[in-house]
Structure formats: C-alpha cells, structure tokens
Amino acid sequence: MTLATPAHKRILLKLSGEALMGDDAFGINRATIVRMVEEIAEVTRLGVQVAVVIGGGNIFRGVAGGSVGMDRATADYMGMLATVMNALALADAMDKQGLTARVMSAIGIEQVVEPYVRPKALQYLEEGKVVVFAAGTGNPFFTTDTAAALRGAEIGAEVVLKATKVDGVYTADPMKDPSATRYAKLTFDEAMSRNLGILDATAFALCRDQKLPIRVFSIVKHGALKRVVMGEDEGTLVYA
C-alpha cells in the first residue's frame, strides 16, 4: 500500500491567541494547546515543514488597548509581548509531545527567545523543527495576520493556513444564518469584491501580490489540519 503524499511541503500556520483559550474567557487553556500540538505533530510526521505565527488576543489585544485611551503603539508592543508568552507555551507543549520547537521573536528579547533571523529559520525548517514566530512583525500598527503573510512569503511557504473556529469562509455568518454555505475556493479578487474579511487588508494584499494562497479552516475540527495538508476539500482556499 502506497502512503499518500502531502500536497504541501512547507506551510505557515496562523493561530489566533483566542484559539488558545479553549472555552475559557482569558489566557491559555493547556488542554486546548495540547490538542492543537497533537494535530501539528501529525502533519510533521508526514514530513511537512511547519512554521507557526501566533496571535496574542487571549492575553492582550493592541487594538482594544488603543481604543480605550492607551497610546496605540504602546498597546501594540504589549500585544507583541503577549504573543511571546503564547509562543513559549506552544513550544513547551510541542517539546513535551516529542517535537523540537524553536521560538523566534521579531523584537529583541534574547534571554527568553532567539531573534528572528531568516536563514536560521529556514535551517530549522529543513532540519524538521517547528518554528514559532513571535512578536508579529516587530512593528506597531501591523497585525499578526500581516506577520503571517510576511513570514509565509519570507520562508517560501506554499500556503498560509488561517486557523479559525469556523470550517472555512461562508456566504454569511453560519452561526446566525443556517442557510449560509461554505465557499470551497475563491480568487483573491472575488474575496475582495465580496468584502469577506478573511485577513486584514495589508495581509491580504501581501498574499495576493506574492501569489501566496490562503486556506481558512477550523482548528477546532479534529483532523482538519491533516486533511488540509493532504490536499483534501477542507475549509476555503483563496488563490491568485
């Protein structure tokens, strides 16, 4: 029996901070992280190189901080530090699962994690290590979605996988409209004209210009990540 070959050799997985909360209202739910890491371990065993960009919304959201009187740049830097905390938690869970993880930060915090250096990140991926990119782009006013698009382009990822709580992009909010249907695939232009809000505008434009496909899928759905990596009809593909 021939084992199926993954459709992608190198992926960039975008995880929101909120995804780490599980059913909690705040913070990091250990059981949720362990389950996510098991899904990631499953695809690394297939020989897929995995890089992760993690958000920080479960701890602090820069946008929210800025909206209540805090200086926006300061709030964004706090958000970046929140992503470092999440990245450390994720890497710790990976190490306990038998994966080798390396956290690389876009801001200097050398006693805790190593700085992001592109050739080093590529070397880690080639060695089969999981690279977790922390601190977004290192700049205020840029989201972690934009960091995912940027790092995806930099490392030559074949696809950006945006992990959400919904299994793809729908014609309407499936939680509110039972008749909403899932798009199997969309072009970048179609997604823009329908104003579907898949990524923020900067991230979306970067992916479109670099012809870097995006696949939106549910991280809550067991086995969905593996199905995506194997090229099965899972989630929604946005392509050039």
Curated annotation (Swiss-Prot):
It is found in: Cytoplasm. GO terms for cellular component: cytosol. Its main location: cytoplasm. ATP binds at K14, L15, S16, G17, G57, R61, T164, Y170, D173. Inhibited by UTP. Pathway: Pyrimidine metabolism; CTP biosynthesis via de novo pathway; UDP from UMP (UMPK route): step 1/1. Its EC number is 2.7.4.22. GO terms for molecular function: ATP binding; UMP kinase activity. Coiled coil: none annotated. GO terms for biological process: 'de novo' CTP biosynthetic process; UDP biosynthetic process. It holds the Pfam family AA_kinase. Keywords: ATP-binding, Cytoplasm, Kinase, Nucleotide-binding, Pyrimidine biosynthesis, Transferase. The keyword S-adenosyl-L-methionine does not apply. It catalyses: UMP + ATP = UDP + ADP. UMP binds at G56, D76, T137, G138, N139, P140, F141, F142, T143, T144. Belongs to the UMP kinase family. Homohexamer. Catalyzes the reversible phosphorylation of UMP to UDP. This is Uridylate kinase. The lineage of its organism: Bacteria, Pseudomonadati, Pseudomonadota, Betaproteobacteria, Burkholderiales. The gene is pyrH.
